[in-house]
């Protein structure tokens, strides 16, 4: 379901971005999707007719989160941050941020490994900034920036997961490739070179396949343009101006006492290092697919920034790593929704037109990776659009 809406949003993005030059769309693709486009435009148009939204049910949210901690033991703890009318209206911590090796109470300033929520908040936002400055175009070919890359892949294919690339490459597989090439130590340049030359399961534009490799590729495009690593660029271009002093990759040692640990392997808990093996081992912690650390309030600040972008830029942004959907509101009409989840137990859902967002950060994989967070996420999302 999410994949189909991403595709719809991609088409809408083209129409809005190039409305004076619709011929850029291939005629066959346009005619094939005409009915879908009309329906999507109708949904978005009706979203603007929504009346004032019902206040977020904070007490009910507290209840479902506490049940997940105390009754169902799905998570050790969580931080919930709610944005209403473009401002943070609620920030609450629950349970514990650590239970192994010792119990530590959760605090609202706890720093989380965002996992795949790094895609929209990191590489996706970086690409969005560069597009707004005219330094990058969604129709640019990736090979313009990474010469050895597949020649038919455009930036838009990376953003919308239509590149045809595999979903993932395990650290074990990459390690074997490195050894075969005589490379003894994992280095990011060898990882991107392997991605650039890998066999693709499907042709470009043929099939939606969510892929971490797309956003590692996007990261390297960004770095080629700005001339520095994405961590440095985003810290000073976006995170610090938003007041997000701790947001970014590779958190400082001085912040470790505020970081929520993730999975414990052989009695050693991952703390301060990204949980994702591809990002941690093969990209040495700075990766487009994962690795951003932040507090719930910092993610909310990012969401507010995103909601205040011009509509056309925002729609491009929904394609820059965010799932897109049209959800029903309390009035029975529709509004655009952007959302993304992270493997460690993180999620962000944004309703840009209503200036509302819900950020739920948990360390679901602590101390063991064995619980499903989908019911809790679904319950909170339903509260966002009662």
Show which residues each predicted segment covers.
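Short, surface-exposed beta-strand/loop micro-motifs that present aromatic residues
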Residues: 337, 344-357
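A short acidic/small-residue loop/turn micro-motif
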Residues: 95-99, 310, 365-367
């Amino acid at each position: 379901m999410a994949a189909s809406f991403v595709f719809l949003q991609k088409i809408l993005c083209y129409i809005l971005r190039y409305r004076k030059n619709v011929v850029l769309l291939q005629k066959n693709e346009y005619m094939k999707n005409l009915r879908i486009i009309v329906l999507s435009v109708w949904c978005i148009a009706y979203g603007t007719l929504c009346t004032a939204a019902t206040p977020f049910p904070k007490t009910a949210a507290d209840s479902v989160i506490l049940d997940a901690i105390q009754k169902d033991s799905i998570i050790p703890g969580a931080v919930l941050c709610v944005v209403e009318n473009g401002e943070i209206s609620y920030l609450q911590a629950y349970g514990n941020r650590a239970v192994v090796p010792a119990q530590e109470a959760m605090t609202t300033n706890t720093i989380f490994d965002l996992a795949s929520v790094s895609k929209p908040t990191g590489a996706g936002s970086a690409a969005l900034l560069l597009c707004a400055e005219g330094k990058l175009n969604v129709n640019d070919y990736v090979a313009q920036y990474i010469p050895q890359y597949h020649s038919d892949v455009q930036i838009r294919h990376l953003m919308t997961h239509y590149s045809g690339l595999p979903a993932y490459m395990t650290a074990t597989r990459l390690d074997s490739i490195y050894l075969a090439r005589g490379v003894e130590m994992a280095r990011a340049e060898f990882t991107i070179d392997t991605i650039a030359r890998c066999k693709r399961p499907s042709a470009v534009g043929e099939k939606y396949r969510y892929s971490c490799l797309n956003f590692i590729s996007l990261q390297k495009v960004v770095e080629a343009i700005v001339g520095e690593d994405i961590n440095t660029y985003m810290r000073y271009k976006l995170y610090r101006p938003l007041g997000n002093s701790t947001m970014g990759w590779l958190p400082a040692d001085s912040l470790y006492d505020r970081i929520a640990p993730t999975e414990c392997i052989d009695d050693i808990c991952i703390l301060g290092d990204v949980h994702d093996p591809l990002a941690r081992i093969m990209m040495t912690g700075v990766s487009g697919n994962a690795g951003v650390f932040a507090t719930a309030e910092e993610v909310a600040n990012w969401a507010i920034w995103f909601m205040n972008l011009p509509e056309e830029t925002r729609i491009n942004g929904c394609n820059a790593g965010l799932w897109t959907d049209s959800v029903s509101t309390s009035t029975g009409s529709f509004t655009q929704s952007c959302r993304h989840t992270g493997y460690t137990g993180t999620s962000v859902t944004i309703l840009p037109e209503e200036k509302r967002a819900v950020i739920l950060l948990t360390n679901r994989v602590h101390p063991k990776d064995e619980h499903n967070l989908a019911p809790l996420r679904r319950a909170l999302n339903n509260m966002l659009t009662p």
